[in-house]
């Protein structure tokens, strides 16, 4: 346990970090249930939490309000703890349309979803780490409070194999089928197995690149090895191995049979109710849909929408909370909630929205009443299941303020940077004044963020700035997570200088190049111009030594005054600390990395990483010779079932043919 977690960093805690770390550790050791880390933007809150995790030596779940921040945190913790199990648990849907019914137009919308296989693998890897390891750090979104397969059923479905043990091949293959692995005779992919005589190759669902080879001899496990499924190279011999199921929803056969019987009983009760109310169409619809699901479960062990029967599959009573990621956490775990002023209300709102949609489905005969128990946790259930918790925010919400037993303040930054200077200027000339400020900041080689109140205003401002020769982009709500991170990355790289948005430029975005934040119509009181929103938005310029914020307003609202007072209080404390310790503020030099590396696999990144070689200086004869050589390699790889290598060579082959045609 001595070095269970080890931080790799060139820096030591500085500024307010040592005090905050000591305060939080003391609170945890004293048994405090809830604490808050009130840390300003750029004060190194992630580094502080990393030191708390290292000191406490406990598995940790970190929750972020969205996939963007979760990916950023995942990258940072992965860098701090390269020797530990840092995992990523977010929704695996690239696209998700839930099942719904609109009575007004008699429209039923089928469930439609596109699952990201890479994220599904990372989710399985996360629960595996919690089961197998004491040094797990799981970075998650609110997806953590949604129903997941029952851990007891999941653990009963594991396949354990040891070298030298007696094991019949047919039993192993049957077990793999029960675990929902599919058999293949071609290239081995995640969640598949392949049989070649007495050799069974398995590509575990939780593994990204490595597969397992089981060699049998006379019904005895003769050898176990990890190997590369692409090249076939043996990487390591193993004394034993545990294969985890392909999905969290895998269920033992006897539980499936019990579920089917309970579903049949509920179906008869519900049909009697609907017929008594003369809802004949609803009764016929429910019977048809449920009988189809029952048949699928009996034949295949699962059905589309099997999560709607999760009450029976996990053997729970009506109304009981569903199993979630929290059920996989050990009792001594820590819970960290990042940007808690956003995440906590988000957790509280999930249950009600889900319930309203499902009640309509139940009332109109699309689902049995037990489907209502396939739901996210209610807020009180989340509180019951939460281990010791630390909330992190620059602007804690009312819940954290009321329930925290200890508040550790982290106002002084390790870099000595002070909060941005805030100016107030009139609304009447805001656009022209902003244009002049933008030109000055661009001349210094820095970037600008501008927030507006409406989508229309953001579009018009973007068009106006663009017409005047300014490189500007508009970040709107339709941009997906990956594209959004690419836009922010391009801003940092200087592909453009000004980013205009509405409510998308607040929490957690790490952009040290931004020297000016402009808030238009700052005196329009409301959600987008509340005290918390203003402090968070002003904070986007806090990572730059020349950081400034301009609020365009004709009146000073209550929210503005409170935000200005808090910013000034922090500035005074930071200046006093710098003066006392002789610190000169330094800007943050942070490399522009793809923070989604490991969390997403994008086409753009692949193209950059795998730029095909150019043969512009070759003669036609040399090109033709190279084309023939590549063609032979391509077919050789294809015959060896090394299709990925064959595809790479094919791309190069086509490129050369194209060049030859141009000569």
UniProtKB/Swiss-Prot annotation:
SUPFAM superfamilies: C-terminal UvrC-binding domain of UvrB, P-loop containing nucleoside triphosphate hydrolases
Residue span, Helicase ATP-binding domain: 26-414
The keyword Ribonucleoprotein appears for this protein: no
Major location category of this protein: cytoplasm
Compartment(s) of residence: Cytoplasm
Superkingdom to which the source organism belongs: Bacteria
Gene Ontology process terms (BP): nucleotide-excision repair; SOS response
GO terms, molecular function: ATP binding; ATP hydrolysis activity; DNA binding; excinuclease ABC activity
Location of the Helicase C-terminal domain: 430-596
Keyword DNA damage attached: yes
Positions of the UVR domain: 624-659
Gene3D superfamilies attached to this UniProt entry: 6.10.140.240, P-loop containing nucleotide triphosphate hydrolases, UVR domain
Keywords: ATP-binding, Cytoplasm, DNA damage, DNA excision, DNA repair, Excision nuclease, Nucleotide-binding, SOS response
Motif (Beta-hairpin): 92-115
GO-annotated cellular components: cytoplasm; excinuclease repair complex
InterPro entries, A to Z: Helicase/UvrB_N, Helicase_ATP-bd, Helicase_C-like, P-loop_NTPase, UVR_dom, UVR_dom_sf, UvrB, UvrB_inter
Residues that bind ATP: 39-46
Record's function text: The UvrABC repair system catalyzes the recognition and processing of DNA lesions. A damage recognition complex composed of 2 UvrA and 2 UvrB subunits scans DNA for abnormalities. Upon binding of the UvrA(2)B(2) complex to a putative damaged site, the DNA wraps around one UvrB monomer. DNA wrap is dependent on ATP binding by UvrB and probably causes local melting of the DNA helix, facilitating insertion of UvrB beta-hairpin between the DNA strands. Then UvrB probes one DNA strand for the presence of a lesion.
Oligomer status and interactors: Forms a heterotetramer with UvrA during the search for lesions. Interacts with UvrC in an incision complex.
Family statement: Belongs to the UvrB family.
Domain comment as written in the entry: The beta-hairpin motif is involved in DNA binding.
Protein name per its UniProtKB record: UvrABC system protein B
């Amino acid at each position: 346990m001595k070095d269970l977690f080890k931080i790799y960093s060139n820096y030591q805690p500085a500024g307010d970090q040592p005090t905050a770390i000591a305060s939080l550790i003391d609170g945890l050791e004293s048994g405090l249930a809830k604490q808050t880390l009130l840390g300003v933007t750029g004060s190194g809150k992630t580094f502080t939490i990393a030191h708390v995790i290292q000191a406490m030596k406990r598995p940790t779940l970190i929750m972020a309000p969205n996939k963007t921040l979760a990916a950023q945190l995942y990258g940072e913790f992965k860098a701090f703890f390269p020797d530990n199990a840092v995992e990523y648990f977010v929704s695996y849907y690239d696209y998700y349309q839930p099942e719904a019914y609109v009575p007004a137009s008699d429209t039923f919308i089928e469930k439609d979803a596109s699952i990201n296989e890479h994220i599904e693998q990372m989710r399985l890897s996360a629960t595996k780490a919690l089961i197998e390891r004491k040094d797990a750090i799981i970075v998650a979104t609110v997806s953590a409070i949604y129903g997941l397969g029952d851990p007891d059923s999941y653990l009963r479905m594991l396949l354990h194999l040891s070298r030298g043990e007696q094991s019949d091949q047919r039993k192993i293959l049957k077990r793999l089928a029960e675990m929902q692995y599919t058999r293949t005779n071609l290239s081995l992919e995640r969640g598949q197995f392949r049989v070649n005589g007495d050799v069974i190759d398995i590509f575990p669902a939780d593994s990204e690149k490595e597969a397992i080879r089981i060699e049998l001899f006379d019904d005895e496990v003769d050898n176990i090895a990890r190997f590369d499924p692409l090249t076939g190279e043996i990487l390591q011999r193993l004394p034993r191995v545990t294969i985890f199921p392909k999905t969290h929803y895998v269920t033992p056969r006897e539980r499936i049979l019990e579920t089917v019987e309970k579903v049949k009983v509920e179906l008869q009760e519900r049909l009697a109710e609907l017929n008594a109310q003369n809802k004949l169409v609803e009764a016929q619809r429910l019977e048809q849909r449920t009988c189809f699901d029952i048949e699928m479960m009996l034949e295949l062990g699962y059905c589309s929408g099997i999560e709607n029967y999760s009450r029976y599959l996990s053997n729970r009573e009506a109304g009981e909370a569903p199993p979630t990621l929290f059920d996989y956490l050990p009792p001594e775990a820590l819970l960290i909630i990042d940007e808690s002023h956003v995440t906590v209300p988000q957790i509280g709102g999930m249950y009600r929205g889900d319930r309203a949609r499902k009640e309509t489905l139940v009332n109109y005969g699309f689902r049995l009443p037990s489907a209502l128990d396939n739901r996210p946790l209610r807020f009180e259930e989340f509180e019951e299941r939460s281990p010791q918790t630390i909330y992190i925010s620059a602007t804690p919400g009312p819940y954290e303020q009321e329930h925290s037993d200890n508040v550790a303040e982290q106002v002084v930054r390790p870099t000595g940077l002070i909060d941005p200077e805030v100016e107030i200027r009139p609304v009447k000339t805001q656009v022209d004044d902003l244009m002049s400020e933008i030109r000055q900041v661009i001349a210094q080689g820095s970037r600008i963020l501008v927030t507006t109140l409406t989508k229309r205003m953001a579009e018009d401002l973007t068009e106006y700035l663009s017409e005047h020769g300014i490189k500007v982009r508009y970040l709107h709500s339709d941009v997906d997570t990956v594209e959004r991170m690419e836009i922010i990355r391009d801003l940092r790289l200087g592909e453009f200088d000004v980013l205009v948005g509405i409510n998308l430029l607040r929490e957690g975005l790490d952009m040290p190049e931004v020297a000016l934040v402009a808030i238009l119509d700052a005196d329009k009181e409301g959600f987008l111009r509340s005290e918390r929103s203003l402090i968070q938005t002003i904070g986007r310029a806090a990572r730059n030594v020349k950081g400034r914020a301009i609020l365009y307003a004709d009146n000073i609202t209550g929210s503005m005054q409170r935000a200005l007072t808090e910013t000034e209080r922090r500035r005074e404390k930071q200046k006093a600390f710098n003066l006392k310790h002789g610190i000169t503020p330094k800007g943050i030099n942070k490399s522009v990395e793809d923070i989604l590396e490991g969390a997403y696999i994008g086409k753009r990144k692949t193209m950059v990483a795998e730029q095909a070689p150019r043969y512009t200086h070759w003669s036609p004869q040399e090109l033709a010779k190279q084309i023939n050589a590549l063609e032979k390699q391509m077919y050789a790889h294809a015959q060896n079932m090394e299709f990925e290598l064959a595809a790479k060579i094919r791309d190069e082959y086509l490129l050369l043919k194209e060049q030859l045609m141009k000569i």
